[in-house]
Amino acid sequence: MDVTQSNATKDDANITVTPWPYTETAAAFIILVVSVIILVSIVGNVLVIVAVLTSRALRAPQNLFLVSLACADILVATLVIPFSLANEIMGYWFFGSTWCAFYLALDVLFCTSSIVHLCAISLDRYWSVTKAVSYNLKRTPKRIKSMIAVVWVISAVISFPPLIMTKHDEKECLINDETWYILSSSLVSFFAPGFIMITVYCKIYRVAKQRSSTVFVAKNGLERQPSQSETCFVRKDKFEKESPSSNSSESNQRQEELDDIDLEESATSDNKPKSSRFSNRRRVDGARCCPQRTCRISWVSSQEQSSKQLAVASKTKVAQMREKRFTFVLTVVMGVFVLCWFPFFFTYSLHAICGDSCEPPEALFKLFFWIGYCNSSVNPIIYTIFNRDFRKAFKKICLLDCAAHLRDSCLGTLGRLNAKCIFECHQKSNQEETAN
């Protein structure tokens, strides 16, 4: 929200514009820094979008929030920051009152949408933690897209007033500076969503802490599960058993003992085996267990069951660890967003309450203003530093682009050099895909 006043003055017939507020060196430095911010914002957030849409590890429905958030940051970098930079360097608004109204509305829209996105993400995480089974079944792409649409509608409603409350002046672009509007817009656009985010993440932390204190440990890592077919206790001397091991010493050791076996019974008139699952084990007689049927008795292989259970447990653990990493990353994103925008909104609101008595220095206020814009370029950096899945996806995207350029250059070579180059390109791409 640009509240920088212009240095333009009007005479009766002519418009006299004061010199630029910065020296050439200072202006060049500011342009360079802001250009880097714009470039990082666009490239980084485009990478985020491509990574979420193409990486298998990032294709969860809830990550669509990150795609929408990245789109908002790209729009800030393309439709807001360049005009703010021009207004800052020249010292007056050059683009007319009509675009000024749209510019201020877009500024409020994208800033508000960013924090409302983070608010929606925090609620999504909270529901996934507190209502894991029921909510995760409802956590479909369609539902997430509906939530994203609501986020943008809320942001659009909040950003509508600047279109009708802008001061119409060809040489300055100022938003409504009335106290009621400053306080209400700051409350709705920042403080209220920020309070909701912080409260929700505190609850998530509390729930996670309670769960981590309750640990269920099964002996040997797994509990014994009943087999899919009927499980009986049968005396060894009444049946001829097929055991994986025909060792005589093992047979002597098991003799006259009641052992847990897997009974697969098939009727002579049926080709398909009939199996039934019993939750309670029963002690039965051999004749009652298989009356006039072809019976095959084999020892239960706990190794096969254990391997299946380990595979399921491993997948569940990987999903839980990925969810924890993402929750941590989003906590960092939320914290950085608050740190970037809090100084601006605090001084903006404080000035509306106290007036000139607590007005911050102009240079400090401008610094807070531009720190808020820097947030658009920070999220991709956070994803890269703190999340391994994003790091792998970014690396894969960059390497694939590099491999594509190498292939293009290979097409210009001849003979064996061409074939060798193409082979190396494919090899690098395949190695990277295998590693991921």
UniProtKB/Swiss-Prot annotation:
Any one GO biological process: adenylate cyclase-inhibiting adrenergic receptor signaling pathway
Report the membrane topology from the UniProt record.
Answer: Multi-pass membrane protein
> What Gene3D superfamilies does this protein map onto?
Rhodopsin 7-helix transmembrane proteins
Q: Which keywords, in A-to-Z order, does the entry hold?
A: Cell membrane, Disulfide bond, G-protein coupled receptor, Glycoprotein, Membrane, Receptor, Transducer, Transmembrane, Transmembrane helix
Q: Where is this region: Disordered?
A: 238-280
A single GO cellular-component term from the record reads: plasma membrane
Q: Would the keyword Transmembrane turn up in this protein's UniProt record?
A: yes
Point to the regions of Acidic residues compositional bias: 257-267
- Per the record, what ranges lie on the membrane's Extracellular side? 1-27, 91-100, 168-178, 354-366
The answer, when asked if Protein biosynthesis is one of the entry's keywords, is: no
Give the highest taxon in the source lineage. Answer: Eukaryota
Instruction: Report the PROSITE patterns cross-referenced here.
Output: G_PROTEIN_RECEP_F1_1, G_PROTEIN_RECEP_F1_2
* Residue intervals annotated with topology Cytoplasmic: 53-64, 124-144, 203-329, 388-436
The principal localisation class reads: membrane
InterPro entries from the UniProt entry: ADR_fam, GPCR_Rhodpsn, GPCR_Rhodpsn_7TM
According to the record, glycans are attached at N7, N14
Location comes to: Cell membrane
Instruction: List GO molecular-function terms, semicolon-separated.
Output: alpha2-adrenergic receptor activity; epinephrine binding
Disulfide-linked positions? C100-C173
| Pfam families the record matches | 7tm_1
Q: What are the transmembrane regions?
A: 28-52, 65-90, 101-123, 145-167, 179-202, 330-353, 367-387
Described purpose of this protein according to its UniProt entry: Alpha-2 adrenergic receptors mediate the catecholamine-induced inhibition of adenylate cyclase through the action of G proteins.
Instruction: Please report which protein family the annotation says this sequence is part of.
Output: Belongs to the G-protein coupled receptor 1 family.
Protein name per UniProt: Alpha-2 adrenergic receptor
